[in-house]
Amino acid sequence: MSYAIICSSKTGNTKKLAQRAREVLGEKNECSTADADLVLLGSWTDKGGLDPALEDALPQLAAKRVFLFGTCGFGGSQAYYDRVLDRFQSALPEGAQVVGRFMCQGQMPPAVRARYVTMAEQDPKRFEPMIENFDRALGHPDAADLTAFEVALRAAL
């Protein structure tokens, strides 16, 4: 099966998932979006949705089978991941057929934690949970995330 990957990865987390997809699907089968049987659309989460930089690529997905994937700094809840993926999906053009979806937590840059620590001095009740989430996100996507991604991708084939 031929496939194309359209991916935006600000910190490298979503890029790790894209690389796993290449390993699963075989690099020799990757082709242009126009020629692909399946298009994998991946994004880091920007304010709860797709990276706006991907907007120009979306119209070409109108008649394509699409597998959505991404990473986000906040995690721990499939319900949250589903809401983010719903926003990703709502950005697709009419006629795009979503055949699978996957989202996992991704680690954030150290500057984010430093900002949370500073803000926690003023509002610890609000920012301590954010620091705890940051610490839980370290190392993600991890091996378990990559395995879960592979399972979701294979199920969509």
What are these regions (language model features)?
Residues 2-9:
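Terminal, regulation- and interaction-focused segments at domain boundaries
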Residues 3, 20-28, 46-157:
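FMN-binding flavodoxin-like domain, especially the glycine-rich phosphate-binding loop
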Residues 7, 32-33, 59:
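Generic structural signal for beta-strand residues in well-ordered domains
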Residues 12-16:
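Short N-terminal binding/cap micro-motifs at the start of the first secondary-structure element
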Residues 26-37:
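Short acidic low-complexity segments
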Residues 37-40, 65:
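Structural motif
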Residues 43:
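Conserved strand-to-loop "acid loop" that flanks and positions the catalytic carboxylate
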